[in-house]
Amino acid sequence: MKKLKLNYLLIGVVTLLLAVALWPAIPWSGKADNRIAAIQARGVLRVSTIATPLTMYRAGDTMSGLDYELSQAFADYLGVKLKITVRQNISQLFDDLDNNDADLLAAGLVYNEARSQHYQAGPIYYSVSQQMVYRVGSLRPRSLASIKEGQLTIAPGHVAQSELEQLKASKYPDLTWRVDPKLSSNELMLQVAQGTLDYTIADSVAISLFQRVHPQLAVALDLSDEQPVTWFSRRSSDNSLSAALLDFFNQINEDGTLARLEEKYLGHGNDFDYVDTRSFLRAVDSVLPELQPLFEKYATDIDWRLLAAISYQESHWDSQATSPTGVRGLMMLTRNTAQSLGLTDRLDAEQSISGGARYLKDMMSKVPESVPEEERIWFALAAYNMGYAHMLDARALTAKQKGNPDSWSDVKQRLPLLSQRPYYSKLTYGYARGHEAYAYVENIRKYQISLVGYLLEKEKQAAAAAQPKLVQSYPTNITPQGLFPSPFSSLPLGPFSQAGAGGKTHSALPNTLSPVSPR
């Protein structure tokens, strides 16, 4: 998978160029007939989306997602409340714009020329590529020329439709594919993972997240270069909304918010390990149920699933684990640490988990207050692994190299340098296995993603079994405190990949789902 990145330079250039063109619209707060004034008079920013692990979803009592956090921040920027409408497919999203039922679409939508002819695109904030996937163990296609009739199915409205049409016309005249009128990219990927469908196409971000829960899904081919992802609004002679978006994205780019969100949601999508992920999910089924009550009991300040992920990284949930260096137990505590915490038996599961949780809390309390709240845990974990003093050295080295010592994205890049003489010889606390601390934190983040997604999917499967005739419930209007469906579910919650084809009709085939109430 290609490295994911936010297009900071592109955002800056676009902002500079378009700000000139949109300058008359920038003082939008004083105009009564523009869209920003209408939003502020209404007191609500209306955003339509599709629930995915990257865009917006609810896990427990917490709302998450890159587009959710950006939407909430933009609503705060405008001084209004946020109203989210969840739709089933891409076509319904653009219908919301056409019918003036939404101010913005924030759903991981790919920018393309066809869409730009009918809708106003906002700043580009990350990029994806389109990839064909297959099931591990089945025949991997080496090129589109090897695809036989009936093997490739894509979701309606997917941007791959236009890509495939161009490839068929230019290079693969015998290429055929099917557009399923009912299933989303999410559901098609699930069918591929289960072996009931040969191939489908999704975007690289969607695939990387899906693999954390279904490691048997693998990438066969790259079908496109990196494609920009953006928000969309209605085209209008009034440019106040576009001007406000440009100013907002420029502001969060300059203050570091955009970089922090990139690190949070896109900073751990590479280096997928099939064997490791599969082993982890097997342990979730076979070992975790016995330990889960203890993780829930002692994870007072962090998500219990994160504490469980830390323990798996430390010991693979083996309460008898012992390393050559003398650390032992589920949380692999040293003898001195255990004594300082009042523990009498490091091999006792409850003592180890409670001690590890308290030690981690102590590390978090030492992280400088200037570090953003949501990133403090990663600094604490690095300190947990290599020692607090070496974490301070990593921050100092980051600042010396003109990076941001309060940004985990910046600091983690310097961790491997702590084991290189030209760097550690000039640091206060000297040599450290910084490369191990880097891998340690990244592995924990990946395990947490897998665990959250896997457990959410199991919950949905159990609910579906108890209520087989699930009533379709779209559209759903929510606030940040409202109900939000799980994005990892095999139920029709919407596709992971929202890279739909352009055009005013929005999708290749008409919708087959009807809203529960008129819009």
From Swiss-Prot:
Residue spans of biased composition, Polar residues class: 508-519
Any one of the GO CC terms: cell outer membrane
Source organism superkingdom: Bacteria
Pfam families reported for this sequence: SBP_bac_3 (PF00497), SLT (PF01464)
Region described as LT domain: 270-519
Keywords attached to this entry: Cell outer membrane, Cell wall biogenesis/degradation, Lyase, Membrane, Signal
Region (Non-LT domain) location: 33-269
Domain notes: The N-terminal domain does not have lytic activity and probably modulates enzymatic activity. The C-terminal domain is the catalytic active domain.
Function in brief: Murein-degrading enzyme that degrades murein glycan strands and insoluble, high-molecular weight murein sacculi, with the concomitant formation of a 1,6-anhydromuramoyl product. Lytic transglycosylases (LTs) play an integral role in the metabolism of the peptidoglycan (PG) sacculus. Their lytic action creates space within the PG sacculus to allow for its expansion as well as for the insertion of various structures such as secretion systems and flagella.
Protein's recorded name: Membrane-bound lytic murein transglycosylase F
Organism of provenance: Cronobacter sakazakii (strain ATCC BAA-894)
